Structures are given as C-alpha cells and as structure tokens.
C-alpha cells in the first residue's frame, strides 16, 4: 500500500515536522534537482528528484488541493487507486479552497485532508490570519466529508485505519478531514474497551468514568486537557464528574439527524435513540462542552440532549498571545469550564449559593470583561 500513499504540502513541511521525508522519499520534480538547495549541508536537506514521492507545491493552496483531487479521483479516472494526504495549516484549508473541496466531494474523491496546527488558541502567537476556529463548521457543509478533531494519537490511528477501510475496501465515496495540533501533551494508551474503536468513529467515548457523576464534561482536540484540569478542580470541591472525548461533533450531528429522520418515517414503530441520547441516558445531568472552535460546532448536538447543555467556544478573531492567555480570553479554559459547571449545578439546585460563590471567587470571574466575540 505504501507506494500508493502521496504526502502533499504547500510550503510548511518543516513547520509540520515533515522534513525527514525530504531525504527518505524525496520531493517529486519532473526534471529532478536543477539547483543546489540552501540547506544542502544539513541532514534533512531539500532533495528533489524524478523519483520523489512527496509533493511540495509552494505557497498555493489551490494548486496543492488540485493535486490532491487528481490523486483522490485517480481510482476512477485512471483505474489506479492512490491515497493522498494533503497536510496544511487548517485555517488555509476550507477557508480558501471550499469551492474546490465541494467539487471534489461531487467528484467522489477519496483521501485524507490533514488540518495541521489547528485550533484558535492552540496555534498561538500567529494572530488572526492563522488561527482556525471554524474549519469543522465549513467541512460540515460537504455531505460526504467525514471530519474529526481527535485529542490523542490512538484516536487518530483508529480514524485513519477506519477511513482506509471505508474508502478503499468498502468502496464508500467519502473523504476525511482530520485536525491535528502542534501542542505537546501526554498521550495515554488506548483503552481496552471492546467498543472503543466504534465509539471513536461514531464521535465520542468516555475517558473518565465515576459511579454517580453530578456534571458531564465534553472536550475535543487539545481542549480535552482543559476538561481534565477542570475535572480535578471539581473533584477538589467534592463534585464528581465524568469526561468524554468528542472526536467529532459533526458525526454526532449526522447520527442524530439520521435517527430523527428514521423515526419520522416510521411513526408506528418505537422511536430509536441517537448515539448521543443513548450514551448519556445513564445519567440525566448537566453537560458542559468546550472546544477550540466556534460554539456553533458543539451546539450541533443540542437537539439530542435531554438535560441542560452549555457550550464554550472560540467565537471572535484570533489573537497573538500564550495558549494560557488565549484560552482565558476565549473563556474555554479549565476555570471557565469549572464556573460554567458551578452555574449549571446551582441553577439545577444541586449546588448551594455559598459553594457556588466560593468556586466563582476561586476561579477569578471577570464580570466586566467583554465577550470575546465583541472584542
């Protein structure tokens, strides 16, 4: 299968840590290397050759995506199945080439789009031009695009393996959009649950489980770590909680729509439950979701929630600052998750006024701060 895989980048290969491919597989050039590269004295020098595999297209997202589309439709146009991986700054994906992506979907393209350095607060220090907080919302407009925002390496591996099987073995006419980040954090081993792979693909799985939780936290991508921090703070206040890793709010929405549509068409049959409803049926408790994307991303599952549901997101323009400061500014960090949880429990009557105020004071709520989307 390896000879069919084609990595594609515009001009950010070193940013993505892909320079090791220069020497290992080479950069394709129809005329070979016609110059001595500036980094010729380095180990990972810029090596072009007629037998190169990697496509390094320069600063042209449209050209790079055109190459991806040619490879992604090669199975049909040339009876030669190829497996393209186009890796790019996630902000410069659908934001710039959405019409081409729509056309690729219409042409039944098959392959992987990797939105690297994703997340409005995770790619810190590069300002509003680079900080993506809405690519998953844009990807949701393309019917056969399957998009995921995994937090851990094992989730990414499961999704790619599933995608390969779906597209090339089961002949499904889909393509996949996956967001990954440049933030370093601990990668846990894959849980041993029999349903783990299936749940990752369906859109979410539980990563912290307790016997009688009072609040449920949902997180995706790098922001799942903020949920872990919030979980520990809540534990300090005696508030038991469970945490879920949401790999795709888009897929959860598709499942919810499909379930609802089937119920409407079969009014005399017992209504089926969406994956969200079934997963949360054990505990009818408030839920707080926090992501590195606009609130509209996590809002997609609200129709399928039976208990109070609160969403935190990165509505507004990006900023240049540290991740910690950006997450505080956009109100998606651990403290804001904890405060929202305290509010939900107070409104429900589970948390008394004194304890709620104590938590708010500890989390240093800035009452006079403008909402980030109004800044």
Q: Predicted segment positions?
A:
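Thiamine diphosphate
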Residues: 1-188, 195-196, 250, 256-266, ...
């Amino acid at each position: 299968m390896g000879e069919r895989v084609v990595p594609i980048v515009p001009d950010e290969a070193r940013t993505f840590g892909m320079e090791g491919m220069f020497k290992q597989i080479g950069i394709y050039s129809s005329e070979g290397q016609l110059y001595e590269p500036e980094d010729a004295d380095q180990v990972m020098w810029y090596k072009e050759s007629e037998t190169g595999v990697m496509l390094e297209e320069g600063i042209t997202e449209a050209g790079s995506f055109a190459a991806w589309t040619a490879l992604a439709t090669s199975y049909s146009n040339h009876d030669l199945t190829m497996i393209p991986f186009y890796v790019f700054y996630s902000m410069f994906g659908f934001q710039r080439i959405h019409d081409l992506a729509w056309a690729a979907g219409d042409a039944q393209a098959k392959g992987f789009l990797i939105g690297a350095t994703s997340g409005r607060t995770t790619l810190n220090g590069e300002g509003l031009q680079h900080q993506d907080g809405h690519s998953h919302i844009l990807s949701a407009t393309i019917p056969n695009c399957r998009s995921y925002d995994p937090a851990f390496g094992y989730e990414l591996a499961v999704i790619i393996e599933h995608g390969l099987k779906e597209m090339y073995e089961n002949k499904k006419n889909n393509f996949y959009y996956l967001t990954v980040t440049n933030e370093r954090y601990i990668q846990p081993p894959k849980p041993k649950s029999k349903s783990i792979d299936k749940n990752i693909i369906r859109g979410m799985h539980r990563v912290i489980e307790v016997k009688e939780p009072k609040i449920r936290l949902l997180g995706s991508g790098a922001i799942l770590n903020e949920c872990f921090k919030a979980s520990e703070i809540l534990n300090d206040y005696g508030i038991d909680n469970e945490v879920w890793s949401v790999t795709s709010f888009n897929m959860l929405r598709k499942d919810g729509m499909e379930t609802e549509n089937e119920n409407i068409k079969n009014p005399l049959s017992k209504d089926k439950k969406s994956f969200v409803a079934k997963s949360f049926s054990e505990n009818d408790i408030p839920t707080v979701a926090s992501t590195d994307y606009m609130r509209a991303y996590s809002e997609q599952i609200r129709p399928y929630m039976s208990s109070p549901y609160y969403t935190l997101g990165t509505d507004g323009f990006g900023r240049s600052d540290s991740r910690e400061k950006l997450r505080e500014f956009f109100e998606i960090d651990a403290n804001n998750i904890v405060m929202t949880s305290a509010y939900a429990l107070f409104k429900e009557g589970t948390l008394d006024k004194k304890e709620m105020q104590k938590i708010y004071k500890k989390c240093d709520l800035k009452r006079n701060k403008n909402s980030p989307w109004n800044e």
